[in-house]
Structures are given as C-alpha cells and as structure tokens.
Amino acid sequence: MDDVPAPTPAPAPPAAAAPRVPFHCSECGKSFRYRSDLRRHFARHTALKPHACPRCGKGFKHSFNLANHLRSHTGERPYRCSACPKGFRDSTGLLHHQVVHTGEKPYCCLVCELRFSSRSSLGRHLKRQHRGVLPSPLQPGPGLPALSAPCSVCCNVGPCSVCGGSGAGGGEGPEGAGAGLGSWGLAEAAAAAAASLPPFACGACARRFDHGRELAAHWAAHTDVKPFKCPRCERDFNAPALLERHKLTHDLQGPGAPPAQAWAAGPGAGPETAGEGTAAEAGDAPLASDRRLLLGPAGGGVPKLGGLLPEGGGEAPAPAAAAEPSEDTLYQCDCGTFFASAAALASHLEAHSGPATYGCGHCGALYAALAALEEHRRVSHGEGGGEEAATAAREREPASGEPPSGSGRGKKIFGCSECEKLFRSPRDLERHVLVHTGEKPFPCLECGKFFRHECYLKRHRLLHGTERPFPCHICGKGFITLSNLSRHLKLHRGMD
C-alpha cells in the first residue's frame, strides 16, 4: 500500500500588526498613539495646568475638569438622580449619591474587611480604628501559589526585592506574587491581569498600580503609616521622597551634625559596614555648602520604593550626588530664596557659610556677617556699635593682608532708631523709616491710592494701562512683574 503523503498544514494567518505607538513618555516610559494623549498623560508628571477659569483664575490640567468647575459659578447641575430630585455638577457626585438609594458599600477596609458607602467614611474609619496598621494577608485567588506573611517594611510577599526579606513566592506581579502585594486581593489581581489593567487595586479609592510596592506606599496615605524616619531629628514621613527632601534641610547645620554617610547604615551596622557603600562616592558627594534643593515637577504619582530602601533596614539611603541639572531646574536655598542657576545659589550661600571673621569682644562668638554680629551684640549684650565690630573684624584679618571673601563689601552700618534694623546705605534707611511713620507720599492720579515707595506706584500704574513689560518668550503672554512671569514659566516647565 502506497504511503499517502501527509497533508501540509495550512499556513497560519499573519498576526495582526501591533498598532504604532510612536509617542513615548520620558518620565515613566509609557507609549501613546497620538501626541494629544501624551500631552494629557504628561500633565500627571508636571504641575502644568493650562486650562484656566476665566472667572476666578484657577487652573486645571484637563478641559473637562474646567467644565465641571465652571458649573460651580453658574449653578448648573445637569446630572439628576432618578430616585430623588437632587442634581449634581458631575457624574462622580451622582454615582456617590446613588449608593444612598441602592445600599451598596463599594469601599472596603483591607484590615477588618468592613465596607462603607463613601470614601470619606472609610477614611474616618482607618484613622480612628487602624491608624498605622497594615492589612493582614488574605487568601490567594484561584491558580495562585500559597503565600507567606508580607514583609514588615514594604508589605511584599515572597523574596523581597526591596528590603532583602524572604518568603514563599517569587517573581513580580500576580503570576509570581513575589514582589507585589499579592496578599491584598489576589483574586482581583488575577482578574485585572486578564483585563489588561494594573493588577493591584486599592480598596479605599480604587486606584490601581502595576506593582505591590507602589500599592504599599499608596496605602500609607490612607492609614497615616509613616515608616521612614529621619536619623537626625526623628521626624516621620510616609514616602521616601519626602524624607529625602527633608534631609536637605540638615545640610547647613554645620560640622557638628551627624555625617550624611550615616543615613545609609541599616540597623546593627557598624562603622565599617556603614562606610562601605559611601567611601567610593565620597569624592563625588556635594559639600554641605553646595547642597541644593532641586524642585522637580509636582504630581508625579506614588513614589516607588524599589531602590530607595537599603537591604536590611527601613531607612532611606544617603542622597547620591545630584545629576547635572537642566537649565529649567530651580535651585532653592534653605532660607527660602530661589535661584535659576547653581552659580547664583553658590554666590548666595556665601552669606550662610562664609568665613567667620567678625568676633564678639564679650563672649568670643564668631560670625560671617557684620549684621549677624551686631544683632548678637544687641540681643545678648544689650549694645550695638558697628564701628567696634568692624575694628574687631580688621584685627582678625589674615597676616598676609588679604581681605577675607566678602568681608569688605555690603556692610550694614546704618541703623533704624525704632527697630534697630541695619541697612547698607542712608537711602535704604530712609525708605525703611516710612514703615514706622506710615507716610505714603506717592499718589496714583487714576484711582487716588497712595503708596509708600515710588516703585510700588509705578507697578500699580501698570494695572491702569495695557503695558506688560515682562512677556513670556514661549506663549507671548505679558505680565506686570517679574515674579508673575516666573510663576507663569513654571507652567511651561516640563513641556518643552
């Protein structure tokens, strides 16, 4: 019998080409088909609010948010409840109201599994009953492995990639249940994965996250959990980004403060252990006088804990040497002054960290500025005497005759007899005295208002005209003052 050749299988139909997503977010890596979708998404990473209310000036990220806000001015309530005559400005308010009629309780407490009809009721319950408490493990969903207890630091289940703990699961996401909050509603996580949604959902506000550690950080906002402690002042924070920003306030406290390298030391780590991770970077770490607070865009979402916690401890590591900032980055001194460049900030920091060349003849205290010494003499010893302080400063100059940096200019030697403030010139003192006398010698001929200084009058007169001397080079809008222009330019930051 002749062998019958096996029929050749029909060629598989070509797979459908994946849709092009050419627009990528530089912050989180997500891709979008249209530029408009990317712009709308990127607003989450920035403080940009391009849609302004024409009545009150309040800004919004999206046009539909502005449309909802405008109804607060007009009183329009287009969303009507079918069970009662109540009306609402937006569909969200109507949905929250309808649970009164249906008896539905969609908000679940992950600690005791009580359910609530409103988010505010759940929030009150969490703060009263479970303040500082994290959820206990729940049973995993079908088809998912059994889980051990979650990590006490970041609530991960299984081998913890954040803090080095160990457990039963492995991997990341709902299929491995290793680096996520698999114990927080794993059945829902599996269903969400099938629906191509972020698998980890918050039972308090229904926000979804790609990783369990993000949900852990988010849940802390509902329960007031603050696991991140500052090793210098023992203040608590519920996010590592807030702790890092707070640590910068300690940078200018002087040589007596604990070294920054100690931040990365875990519990039980000795001096040698604490120094291993920082010795190689000591040459690149910025000096205390060169620290700067880089103000990143607001609204960046929940900070990820991965890489921010050292192995074996709950404290955040020392801040690494700052990357070279872009030209749009703002620099802020701890005294609250903002600067557009690092050079301007460094020049300003001389006032805080300059050489202590002015000495007090009574107690020997040293100060970098003459005004600071005179303030000390007035408060501590009940006297002034700028000339005596200047003489003492000259006696302390180096033998080489080289004047110390910044010591020969900008001295404040003209004092006010009312409040004893010091000024650099008689003109500045005369301008200041008007504060005590209440005199306002500069009137506006348009509206009759009076002003203490001529510069205030000039700025006010711009309100009556069309001149806007400070235009925006991006959109062309004009402003009366430079400070208003600076605030406006922050709206464009991140979209260039």
UniProtKB/Swiss-Prot annotation:
It comes from Homo sapiens. Its main location: cytoplasm. Residues 259-280 have a biased composition (Low complexity). Interacts with FLT3 cytoplasmic catalytic domain, following receptor stimulation, in a kinase-independent manner. Does not interact with other structurally related receptor tyrosine kinases, including KIT, CSF1R and PDGFR. Interacts with NRL. The modification N-acetylmethionine is found at residue 1. One of its GO terms (biological process) is positive regulation of transcription by RNA polymerase II. May be a transcriptional repressor of NRL function in photoreceptors. Does not repress CRX-mediated transactivation. PROSITE patterns: ZINC_FINGER_C2H2_1 (PS00028), ZINC_FINGER_C2H2_2 (PS50157). SMART domains: ZnF_C2H2 (SM00355). The keyword GTP-binding does not apply. This is Flt3-interacting zinc finger protein 1. Residues 250-280, 378-412 are annotated as: Disordered. Widely expressed. One of its GO terms (molecular function) is transcription coactivator activity. Gene3D superfamilies: Classic Zinc Finger (3.30.160.60).
